[in-house]
Amino acid sequence: MQRKHLLIASAVLAAALIAAGCASVPSPAELDAQAVTMIKSSFRDQGIAKLARLEQDLGQAACSGDKPPADDVAKRVEAEALASIRWPAGGQYLGDWREGERLAQNGRGMTWSDASAAPAGNGAQCYNCHQIDQKEISFGTIGPSLWNYGKLRGVKDVADPASAAIVQYTWGKLWNSKAYAACSNMPRFGHAKLLDEQQLRHLMALLLDPKSPVNQ
């Protein structure tokens, strides 16, 4: 009888401990807060790299969870991103494709060791994620191939009204990629002031100019 009482007492104690353990498990919100605190404590301001970079806007926060954002949130992210696009002055979309290729090859910029965060010191590092010119054998595959980008889309003259939609889409994608895909992995070159208007024109020329090797 005494043994039976001991077993019952042990079972009750075990159940109580389990219940207490379950009750002490942090909520998802608490875990998120702990993670943010840990991340912030692991970094410091260094040169041009500031802790402010850890602050997320709506689009970043919405796409950092374990599930895709709800449709209404994704639509809001895209709408706000589309509204943020600044179209090129004078409707001038194209620059020099040669400069665009240099930017596409250049992965420099925005590190703590860089003297300035100004766009002039930044590259676009397009080849990290895309194939562009087939002569380049080193490229990433996170993004789609951009080989023959303009040619495949029938762009023969960027001033032709028939090409307006793809020209404007391409500019918008470079300026703020979240305008067309809420959780796009592509850098928001214009929105984040990573590149200036003229640099974006050069990238546009690389992709759309019929004379660019990309479209041969």
Where in the sequence are the language-model features?
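Residue-level detector of alpha-helix boundaries and kinks
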Residues: L7, S84-R86, R188
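Local sequence-structure signature of Cys/Sec-based thiol-disulfide redox active-site neighborhoods
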Residues: S113-A124
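Core hydrophobic alpha-helical transmembrane segments of single-pass membrane proteins
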Residues: A11-L17
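Post-cleavage N-terminal segment of exported redox proteins
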Residues: L17-M110, K173, L206-Q216
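Extracytoplasmic electron-transfer domains, predominantly the class I c-type cytochrome c fold
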Residues: E30, Q34, M38-R44, G95-E99, ...
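Bacterial N-terminal signal peptides that target proteins for export
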Residues: Q2-S10
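Secretory-pathway/luminal and periplasmic proteins that interact with or process carbohydrate-rich
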Residues: M110-S113, K135-F139, P213-V214
